[in-house]
């Protein structure tokens, strides 16, 4: 281990801080921290997702912090979790004594309890974030420990959805448990930071020098006292009382109700959800590691909140991030399932970007988000710096906007946070009406879902993620809530499916049934149909011949590639079971293709042509070629076939790549057209009596990869040759 330079500084209140740093083992430190959170209070925030200019990979966390902040409704309790916390409490009590938002404040050696004023002065909408709330109290705590000397010290934890009711007048319909907590934050004094870009993990240790309850001098120090805490082992549940808070068909009914609100103009969009329940038999740390490995995200988290309550998060969405005066958010709206491979992903991305419904979703979300920022930002400073950008996760593809602004000098990070409470992407628009719909129509309280997780720094900065794709584990039961963004274009059945798709990765992580969404690529195609087959490919100076050759070799064909003159000599002298006429530039005549075909016919060798190869076969048998009005170079077309053996197992309509300027104008009677393109061009032929087949499109192209169409076609060619060879050998 390596000890780094110590730093010392004074906070705004005069509290003295000494920070030392120790380098830990990069490979094991974070995993050990995660394991300790199964039984001890603390937080691990983990960003395992990268996006240029937005997200990098890092971990930050701690265990056994000295102080815990617990908010319930209009009350807050600040608990010392060990003797080190008891030393800090008097300073916090002093900081809160003049807070106008507090109606009653009580201090004791091991805790501070307070309640908020029931009525406060009226504020303009621009100053709503200054309304008396638990955040008024947090603002005083932050001011007490304020210093620009350290970027890590601060408050870490979870902000519940119900905190919004301290700012917005929403009529309550849900039945809530009085023991439920709206806010749980920790003030740590030992913070582990892992930077995955440099492969280094540092443990920062903090010591404080404070004043006692009745002292005016800073003489009380945490130095010399152990960082201890009470262990409370995780207790799993074996079963749940229900699988979902919605009965079959109920969520679809909620969507249909929302459509009526849209038609009347009461809402533009709304984001209701449903909750799924699973017995969480494995520990939260185990579930977290599964989720982190299989569902990387920018706002992953494992939190032991005490009272047998844990949060396991893989959130894809930034809530609010503040750095100095700059405030930014990344609203997500627009979702589609990932494809089976990279080609499938590309198709899905195209579908998503072409979806008017998904574009409307995100546009409305970003307009509301810009409005939230305009409450606290300098006029004209709010800008959309990224529009409908693609972010890809284990099972889902999202469209994301990136919005930045610069806050007015009179506002701080908490103002920026509160101006967005809560994000339009989990509520709707207009926001107040959407929250009222959610409160009235959802089947259970949201708890932490739709709130935020993260860090409020004593340096004035803030980094929080939206609490979604998050498992709440309470008394051994995993609660997984997922929502769908509804608007007038919504299909009720599809929206219900989307909630289940979003929840699926978390449910599988709880069950231990990990499935990759894509990410590992398509299965490598191979078959043994070509064993014993010797093929010769004539290279017509094309740039794709080796891709085509690889497809045949994946079918176990022994293949040799030669330029035309050498190929004709080889044909005369060697045994060849299949002649492949490759694509190429120019015309068949340029490569004397008629001479090549002549030799193959004399020796009774089956022929398969691609692109230029098809054109050469057509010309050899008396057909004509013509020039396309517009060249098809690197273009994908929809191809329709008529069911020949060449297309066995291939959909009657499929997409394939084209690279050609010439096309068959007339096809002689001895050749049969077996496939055409959407522009009615000849795309495949076969001889009426001889083993000759050809395609105009490129089966080896990336544009022909969907559903492994190109591979299957080549397999069919090889299978046909193998069958013919077997029949000849049997004679």
What are these model-predicted stretches?
Residues 451, 643-691:
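Catalytic beta-strand/loop cores that center a nucleophilic Ser/Cys/Thr
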Residues 3, 505-595, 599-605, 612, ...:
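N-terminal beta1-alpha1 cap of cysteine-dependent amidohydrolase-like domains
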Residues 366, 538-539, 697:
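Active-site flanking residues adjacent to catalytic metal/cofactor-binding acidic residues
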Residues 559-561, 625, 673:
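Generic structural signal for residues in well-ordered beta-strands
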Residues 573-649, 653-655:
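Cysteine-nucleophile active-site neighborhood
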């Amino acid at each position: 281990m390596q000890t780094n330079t110590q730093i010392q500084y004074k906070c705004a209140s005069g509290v003295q801080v000494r920070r030392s740093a120790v380098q830990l083992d990069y490979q094991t430190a974070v995993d050990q921290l995660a394991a300790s959170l199964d039984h001890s209070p603390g937080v691990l925030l983990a960003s395992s997702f990268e996006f240029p200019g937005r997200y990098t990979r890092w971990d930050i966390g701690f265990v056994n912090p000295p102080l815990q902040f617990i908010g319930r409704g209009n009350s807050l309790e600040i608990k010392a979790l060990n003797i080190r916390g008891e030393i800090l409490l008097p300073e916090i009590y002093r900081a809160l004594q003049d807070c106008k938002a507090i109606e009653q404040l009580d201090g004791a050696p091991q805790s501070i309890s307070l309640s908020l004023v029931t009525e406060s002065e009226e504020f303009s909408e621009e100053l709503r974030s200054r309304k008396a709330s638990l955040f008024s109290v947090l603002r005083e705590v932050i001011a007490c420990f304020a210093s620009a000397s350290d970027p890590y010290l601060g408050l870490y934890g979870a902000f519940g959805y119900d905190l919004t009711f301290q700012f917005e007048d929403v009529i309550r319909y849900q039945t809530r448990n009085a023991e439920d907590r709206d806010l749980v934050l920790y003030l740590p004094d030992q913070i582990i930071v892992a930077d995955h870009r440099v492969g280094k993990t540092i443990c920062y240790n903090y010591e404080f020098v404070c004043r006692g309850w009745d002292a005016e001098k800073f003489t009380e120090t945490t130095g010399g006292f152990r960082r201890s805490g009470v262990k409370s082992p995780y207790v799993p549940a074996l079963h749940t009382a229900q699988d979902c808070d919605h009965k079959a068909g109920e969520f679809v009914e909620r969507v249909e109700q929302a459509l009526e609100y849209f038609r009347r103009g009461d809402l533009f969009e709304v984001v209701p959800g449903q909750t799924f329940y699973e017995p969480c038999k494995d520990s939260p740390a185990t579930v977290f590691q599964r989720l982190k490995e299989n569902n990387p995200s920018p706002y992953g988290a494992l939190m032991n909140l005490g009272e047998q309550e844990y949060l396991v998060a893989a959130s894809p969405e930034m809530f609010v991030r503040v750095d100095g005066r700059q405030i930014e958010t990344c609203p997500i709206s627009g979702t589609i399932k990932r494809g089976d491979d990279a080609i499938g992903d590309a198709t899905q991305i195209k579908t998503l970007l072409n979806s008017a419904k998904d574009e409307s979703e995100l546009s409305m979300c970003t307009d509301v988000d810009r409005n939230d920022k305009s409450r606290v930002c300098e006029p004209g400073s709010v800008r959309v710096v990224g529009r409908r950008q693609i972010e890809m996760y284990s099972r889902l593809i999202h469209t994301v906007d990136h919005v930045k602004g610069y806050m007015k000098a009179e506002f701080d990070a908490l103002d920026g946070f509160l101006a967005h409470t809560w994000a339009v992407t989990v509520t709707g628009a207009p926001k107040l009406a959407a929250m009222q719909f959610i409160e009235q129509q959802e089947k259970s309280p949201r708890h932490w879902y739709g709130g935020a997780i993260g860090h409020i720094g004593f340096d004035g900065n803030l980094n929080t993620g939206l609490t979604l794709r998050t498992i709440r584990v309470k008394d051994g039961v995993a609660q997984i809530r997922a929502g769908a963004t509804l608007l007038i274009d919504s299909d009720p059945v599809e929206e219900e499916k989307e909630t289940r798709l979003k929840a699926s990765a978390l449910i599988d992580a709880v069950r231990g049934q990990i499935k990759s969404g894509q990410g590992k690529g398509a299965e490598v195609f191979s078959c043994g149909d070509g064993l014993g087959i010797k093929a010769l490919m004539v290279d017509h100076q094309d740039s794709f011949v080796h891709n085509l050759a690889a497809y045949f070799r994946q079918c176990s064909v022994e293949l040799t590639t030669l330029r035309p003159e050498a190929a004709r000599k080889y044909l005369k002298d060697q045994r060849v079971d299949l002649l492949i006429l490759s694509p190429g530039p120019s015309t068949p005549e340029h490569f004397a293709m008629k001479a090549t075909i002549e030799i193959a016919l004399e020796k009774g060798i089956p022929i398969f042509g691609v692109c230029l190869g098809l054109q050469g076969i057509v010309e050899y048998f008396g057909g004509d070629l013509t020039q396309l009005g517009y060249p098809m170079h690197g273009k994908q077309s929809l191809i329709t076939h008529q069911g020949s053996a060449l297309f066995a197992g291939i959909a009657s309509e499929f997409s394939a790549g084209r690279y050609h300027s010439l096309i068959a104008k007339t096809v002689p009677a001895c050749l049969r057209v077996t496939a055409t393109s959407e522009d009615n061009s000849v795309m495949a032929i076969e001889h009426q009596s001889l083993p000759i087949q050809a395609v105009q499109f490129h089966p080896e192209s990336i544009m022909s990869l969907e559903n492994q169409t190109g591979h299957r076609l080549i397999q069919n060619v090889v299978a046909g040759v193998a069958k013919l060879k077997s029949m000849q050998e049997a004679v």
